[in-house]
Amino acid sequence: MDINITIFIFLCAALLMLGVITTKFSNRLGVPSLVLYILIGMGLTSYIYYDNASITQLVGIFALIIILFKGGIQAKWKHIKPILGPSTSLATFGVLITAVLVGTCAKYILDLTWAEGMLFGAIVGSTDAAAVFAALGNKNIKTKLTSTLEAESGTNDPMAVFLTVSLIELINEPSTSLWSLPLDFVLEMGLGLLLGLLFGFLSIKIINNINLDSSGLYPVLALSLAIVTFSGTTLLHGSGFLAVYVMALTVGNNDLTYRLSIVRFTDGFAWMMQILMFILLGLLVFPEHLLAITWQGLVLSFILMIIARPIGVFLSMIGTKYTGKEKLFISWAGLKGAVPIVLATYPLIAGVEGSELLFNAVFFVVFTSALIQGATLSPLANKLNLAGPDQEQSPHILELVSMGKTSSEIIEVVLKEGSKVIGKELKDIYLPSEVLITAIVRGEQVVTPRGETILENHDTLYVLIPKAKRQEVKKMFQ
């Protein structure tokens, strides 16, 4: 084997290991892991010359598909439904207001044309799904706020992509008409929503009804369907990112075969893609170029975090049932991450004049946003009394892993208050002969099911069932 190939493989493995270890340090330091991944990439620029924006964009888009799929499949519709209106307003009007304000300031601070200034604003106007999901994942912040922020970050990428592509087209072709843009936006978002739902229900049918030779193939199938959703929707001129998130949300909130396997595989794969993506983004920038725009970058970061984002949030959430403190927290939690940097590669590839300055300025703003805002989310939530109770998650997960075809699966059933089986012994509960309770998780303990075992509120049951009886069995424990 070629020695260069071996070195490349070793380097990739070393970077992934370094990224995993870095995550442990980021939790202890209170710094978002993406900041450390970017620093790793920037530190390697002295040894590795890398300036391929096209490959970075391709990896970034692929990573965002996986991250959006992960976020959507783990989101609960019961949490999303009450905040759908506010999060949609944030993802559209909020992004637009933020983009215009930041773009106007960037025009004068960076000495850009109006179109270039608005392009900068469009690129940094949206929050980032990877950054928000990672920052909120282990924080004890109220569900209402985390759901709002996650829904916003999962749905505002299409707005930023649309504005970025439209402004690049306007810069390269000044004769482009602006009057058709609102209609184009509505059609693109509408098509993304409809195709996301269509692909979502189609994916459920495929995953639940296909009988594969190994359970390990189901997560691969699910991710393949997510990629097909993105590419198919994009080819039809719809919003591929919106379609992926809606598809994942649809799949995740319906009965799904091998759900836990799919979620665990997706979670691990998303982490790997995040590490790779942020290191590549760090490699793409040269530290000396950032130093040349230090004061401009700091001023724009300050304007975005302290002025533009809060104004966008407060204006787009007029009339909603959110307190001033909650709006303030949402304003501060608008983390930037991979999406703006990936979008900043669009003008580079399109050959827009001054695109290198735009890329470096975007990178500076994203880095400072992730570092400052990401590190202060929890203290701010505590200061504003918006921290919820610590969420205790059971360390135990049980699932049927089959080496071949099977018609059975293990489902997870959580006993909620009001369940008719709470307080009963297992021997007094009628279950079909082919249904078996294999384990009961109570807090951090695993209870062996016996006939005299009494079921309690919040118990998690792992039940072996025929796939065809999933709904019937779930109703027995309601």
Describe each PLM feature range.
Residues 383, 429, 476:
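Residues that form generic nucleotide/phosphate-binding pockets
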Residues 89, 412, 462:
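Short aromatic/hydrophobic contact patches that present stacked aromatics
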Residues 416-468:
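Cytosolic Rossmann-like ligand/nucleotide-binding regulatory domains
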Residues 1-392, 404-405, 456, 472:
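Transmembrane helical cores of multi-pass secondary ion antiporters/exchangers
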Residues 85-86, 406-411, 437:
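Short secondary-structure transition/capping segments
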Residues 453, 473-478:
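Short, compositionally biased
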Residues 28-29, 391-427:
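Extended boundary segments
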